[in-house]
Structures are given as C-alpha cells and as structure tokens.
Amino acid sequence: MLAIAAVCGVGAFFYFHSDFSWDSDASDDANGPIANMDQTLPQTVLVSLDNRWVDLSKSKGQVMLLEFFATWCPGCVDETPSLIRIQRKFSNRGFTVIAIAIDDQGEETVESFVKNRQFSLDGASAPLNYPVLMGSVEIAQKLGFEGGLPAGVLVNRDGKEVKIIRGVVSEATLTKTIQRLLEN
C-alpha cells in the first residue's frame, strides 16, 4: 500500500511540475509519451567510440534524435531495430540518430556491445548504422534527459530541442513525428 502511495505521489509531482505538454498524436500511444519542449541545444562535446570529438551544437541544419541508452536496458535493446530502420529511411533527408551511452559499465562494455551485437531486422541481421557517443547521466540531463531508459530528445534543424521521448515509443509514432520535423 505504501509503495502505491509513493508511486502516485511521484506521478503527481511530475504531472504538476512538468514544463512539458503532451503531444496529442502520441498521448494515446500505449507504448509511451512524446512531450513538447522548447530549448536551445546546449553546446555539448562528446567522444565517439572511434575517439572522435563530436560537438552536437554544430549540427544545425540536421534533425537529430539524441537517444540515451545503456547496454543493460532491455527497452533500449528492443527499440534498436526500429531506430536502425528510421535511420535508413531518413538519413538522406537530413536526419540522424545519435546514440548517447549513459552506461555505468564503461566504454569497453559499450564498445563491445556495439561491435558484437547484431539486431534482427526484417528477417536479417544488422549492425548499428548510426554513431554512438559516450556520455553520462549529468550530460544527458543537460540535454533534457529526465531519467528512465530508453529516452530521447528530438532536435530540429534550428538546433532547438523540440520533443522529449520517455520510454519505448512505437516506430510508427516516432516516424510520423520525425517526418513532421523534416517537413518544417
């Protein structure tokens, strides 16, 4: 009973203290909500698994999905085939998925996961087709992460963070949301 009260209390806190509004197209999606947000992408420089420095704020002109994940997160692993398909579908239209590992297991674990993991994709096996950067919970919070994995932030062509994704969202909903951003 105490646990139920605690969950209700936390939920009420986030409901009444949220700076976000629910996206009407995603609010009925049983897989998870997409919320509106409006903040400029802060200057953030992260290192990729191939030791390149990537300044996220220099990606204006691109629509980006900053996907926060960890190797131990089942939802993160489950949604990866959808992200691979979305990257394939929209990469030639100025869109990219950028995975940001906030894994407490370290860079070696993340690198092994990315290099050795094959994802089932339409009856075949496929590797990741988007960059993976090393981050931390603190960096993710600076970028709009509120906690809970999987999670993501959609950034428009002007470098504004416009949507936050909490939990696993259906591929169809995410595709529709990205398509709208690409058309604006």
Identify the residue ranges that each predicted region occupies:
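A short beta-strand-turn-helix
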Residues: Q43-M64, Q87-F90
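Thiol-/selenol-based redox modules, centered on thioredoxin-like
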Residues: G148-N184
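N-terminal targeting signals for export/organelle localization
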Residues: M1-Q43, K163-I164, N184
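Residue-level recognition of beta-strand->loop/alpha-helix junctions
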Residues: A101-D103, M134
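Short, internal strand/loop/helix patches
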Residues: V114-R157
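Hydrophobic beta-strand anchors of alpha/beta hydrolase catalytic cores
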Residues: L65-L66, V97, G152
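Short pre-active-site segment immediately N-terminal to redox-active cysteine/selenocysteine motifs
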Residues: Q62-M64, F68-W72, G148
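Conserved redox-active cysteine motifs that mediate thiol-disulfide chemistry
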Residues: F68-R85
